[in-house]
């Protein structure tokens, strides 16, 4: 059963705004206006809302855990990409410093060219 907030407002006692005194006893109501059946229904509604909030809390915890796992994976991927980029830049800088021109083909590529001719 899904709790209906409008029903809870109807069942609640006089509000602090309407009492104007701010006295806690008047704001919450004395309970004399309600019979036992309405109080039991209110407790059942409270238990229902409490159960619903517990299930929402569990779902949010699971989502938060997945979010944390994804964040960790993304940070690892980012770090890996930074390392790869840095090594490629160092390799390109080394090639430029050594030859100044286009790099020589890899030995495997050179042997394949020789086999074709």
Curated annotation (Swiss-Prot):
A UniProt-annotated Pfam family: UPF0184
Top-level taxon in the UniProt lineage: Eukaryota
UniProt KW keywords: Coiled coil
InterPro entries in the cross-refs: BBLN_eukaryota (IPR005374)
Low complexity composition-biased segments: 12-22
Region described as Disordered: 1-39, 83-117
Coiled-coil region: 50-92
UniProt similarity note: Belongs to the UPF0184 (EST00098) family.
Protein's recorded name: UPF0184 protein AAEL002161
């Amino acid at each position: 059963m899904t709790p209906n907030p409008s029903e809870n407002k109807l069942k609640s006692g006089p509000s602090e705004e309407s009492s104007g005194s701010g006295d806690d006893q008047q704001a919450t109501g004395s309970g004399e206006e309600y019979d036992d059946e309405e109080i039991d229904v209110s407790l059942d509604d409270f238990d229902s809302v409490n159960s619903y909030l517990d299930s929402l809390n569990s779902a949010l915890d699971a989502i938060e855990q997945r979010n944390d796992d994804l964040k960790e994976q993304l940070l690892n991927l980012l770090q890996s990409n930074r390392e790869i980029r840095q090594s490629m830049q160092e390799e390109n800088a080394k090639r430029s410093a050594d030859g100044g021109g286009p790099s020589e083909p890899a030995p495997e590529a050179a042997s394949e060219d020789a086999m074709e001719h």
